[in-house]
């Protein structure tokens, strides 16, 4: 299954969740797109709820189905912690996501583009793989030639706060994952236990 490339505002309204993190998509119409979106209150089945949570989380992090499923299977092989918590941590420690969390990009799609185009380094080495798993202590930075990118400077200026598990140096435009995140620090709008239930039936 390919990655969705349509309007993110439609996804956000369909899920009732701001995928951009700004909340603008839901400010005027906090219901699903379509003429009857505001009055669509059909009861969702248990399977429908599981599927909805899976899609919500997958679209939030911008993964296609194969990438998402493979990461889920990998999380299940980690011996410590719960399957759901480990899955969330693996999603959160992707390089593209941490570029976004550090404020070097205004959205995850923009962060993924920065990584793909070779603007990002990890411990001084260029990394152009968005799915690269960042380890605590590793330093994420912009390449020298990318220091003055307008979209990056704008993103940094508009960043109000950053998660407690990262640090950022505004002067050097470098950041680091200081520790693995705890579940309570991650997306509260998602019930990953439903995602686990969904895949336990499918796989």
UniProtKB/Swiss-Prot annotation:
GO BP terms in the entry = ribosomal small subunit biogenesis; translation
Signal peptide range equals none
* Source superkingdom: Bacteria
Residue ranges of the S4 RNA-binding domain? 93-156
Recorded GO MF terms: rRNA binding; structural constituent of ribosome
Stored InterPro entries: Ribosomal_uS4, Ribosomal_uS4_bac-type, Ribosomal_uS4_CS, Ribosomal_uS4_N, S4_RNA-bd, S4_RNA-bd_sf
Q: Which Pfam family, any one, appears in the UniProt record?
A: Ribosomal_S4
Arranged from A to Z, the UniProt key words for this protein are:
Ribonucleoprotein, Ribosomal protein, RNA-binding, rRNA-binding
GO CC entries: small ribosomal subunit
Keyword Ribosomal protein appears in the UniProt entry: yes
Q: How does it assemble?
A: Part of the 30S ribosomal subunit. Contacts protein S5. The interaction surface between S4 and S5 is involved in control of translational fidelity.
User: Function, please?
Assistant: One of the primary rRNA binding proteins, it binds directly to 16S rRNA where it nucleates assembly of the body of the 30S subunit.
Tell me its family: Belongs to the universal ribosomal protein uS4 family.
- HAMAP family recorded for this chain? Ribosomal_uS4_B
State the protein's name: Small ribosomal subunit protein uS4
Query: Species name for this entry?
Result: Lacticaseibacillus paracasei (strain ATCC 334 / BCRC 17002 / CCUG 31169 / CIP 107868 / KCTC 3260 / NRRL B-441)
């Amino acid at each position: 299954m390919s990655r969705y490339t349509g309007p993110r505002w439609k996804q956000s309204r369909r899920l009732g969740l701001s995928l951009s993190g700004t909340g603008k998509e839901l400010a005027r119409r906090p219901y699903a797109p379509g003429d009857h979106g505001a009055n669509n209150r059909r009861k969702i089945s248990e399977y429908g709820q599981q599927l909805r949570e899976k899609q919500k989380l997958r679209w939030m992090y911008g993964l296609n189905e194969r990438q998402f499923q493979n990461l889920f299977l990998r999380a299940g092989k980690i011996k410590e912690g719960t399957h759901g918590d480990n899955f969330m941590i693996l999603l959160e420690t992707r390089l593209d996501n941490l570029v976004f969390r550090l404020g070097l990009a205004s959205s995850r799609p923009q962060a993924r583009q920065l990584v793909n185009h070779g603007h990002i380094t990890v411990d001084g080495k260029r990394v152009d793989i968005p799915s690269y798993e960042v380890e605590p202590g590793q330093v994420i930075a912009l390449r020298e030639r990318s220091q003055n990118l307008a979209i990056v400077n704008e993103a940094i200026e508009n960043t109000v706060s950053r998660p407690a598990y990262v640090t950022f140096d505004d002067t050097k435009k470098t950041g680091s994952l200081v520790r693995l995140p705890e579940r309570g620090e991650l997306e509260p709008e998602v019930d990953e236990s439903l995602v686990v239930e969904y895949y336990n039936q499918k796989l």
